[in-house]
C-alpha cells in the first residue's frame, strides 16, 4: 500500500477510534436509567430534616457487594461543599484510610441548597460517578473507596441503622 493511501486510512481509523471513546464516555456520563427503587428514608437530626435518601438497583433489591447501585440524596437545607466533604471524611473514619481518599472528592461534592439532589452511581465495574441535579460531575475509579462511600449508608454497622434498614427496603 502506498504512503498516500495509508494516511487517509489512518485518519479514518483515528476518527472512528476517537468517536468510539467519545460515545463510551458520553454513555457513562448520562444519568443512570432503568433502575428500580430498593428503599427510601429521611435523615433528620433532632428537629432538622437534612435529606431524603433513595437507593436503586437493577432489580429493586439490595445484595451486599452487588452493583449497579444508585444513591440519591435530596437535600432540605443548604450545606456547603466543605461541610459535605468534612462529614464524608468523618463518616469514612474506620471504613477507609483517610490518606487514601481521592483528592478529587473535594471537587466532586458541591454546595447544596434546599431541593438540590446529589447522586452517586456505583457501576458494575466498581467505578463511581457523581451527579448534581441530574448533571454529571465526574467519577472515581477507586472501587474500594466507592464501596466505602456507599457503606456510609449501607454498612450493617452504619451510624444510622434505621436509615440503613429503610434504604435496603427492610422497613
Task: Describe the predicted segments one by one.
Residues 26-171:
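Terminal leader/tail segments of proteins
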Residues 22-24:
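N-terminal signal peptide c-region/cleavage motif recognized by signal peptidases
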Residues 2-13:
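Bacterial N-terminal signal peptides that target proteins for export
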Amino acid at each position: 500500500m502506498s504512503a498516500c493511501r495509508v494516511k487517509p486510512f489512518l485518519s479514518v481509523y483515528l476518527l472512528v477510534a476517537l468517536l468510539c471513546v467519545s460515545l463510551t464516555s458520553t454513555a457513562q456520563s448520562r444519568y443512570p436509567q432503568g433502575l428500580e427503587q430498593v428503599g427510601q428514608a429521611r435523615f433528620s437530626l433532632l428537629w432538622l430534616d437534612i435529606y431524603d435518601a433513595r437507593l436503586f438497583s437493577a432489580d429493586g433489591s439490595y445484595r451486599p457487594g452487588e452493583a449497579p447501585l444508585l444513591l440519591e440524596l435530596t437535600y432540605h437545607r443548604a450545606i456547603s461543599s466543605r461541610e459535605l466533604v468534612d462529614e464524608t471524611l468523618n463518616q469514612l473514619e474506620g471504613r477507609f484510610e483517610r490518606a487514601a481518599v481521592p483528592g478529587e472528592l473535594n471537587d466532586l461534592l458541591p454546595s447544596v441548597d434546599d431541593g438540590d439532589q446529589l447522586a452517586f452511581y456505583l457501576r458494575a465495574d466498581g467505578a463511581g460517578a457523581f451527579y448534581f441535579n441530574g448533571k454529571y460531575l465526574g467519577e472515581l475509579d477507586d472501587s474500594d473507596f466507592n464501596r466505602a462511600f456507599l457503606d456510609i449508608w449501607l454498612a450493617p454497622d452504619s451510624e444510622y441503622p434505621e436509615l440503613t434498614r429503610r434504604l435496603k427496603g427492610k422497613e
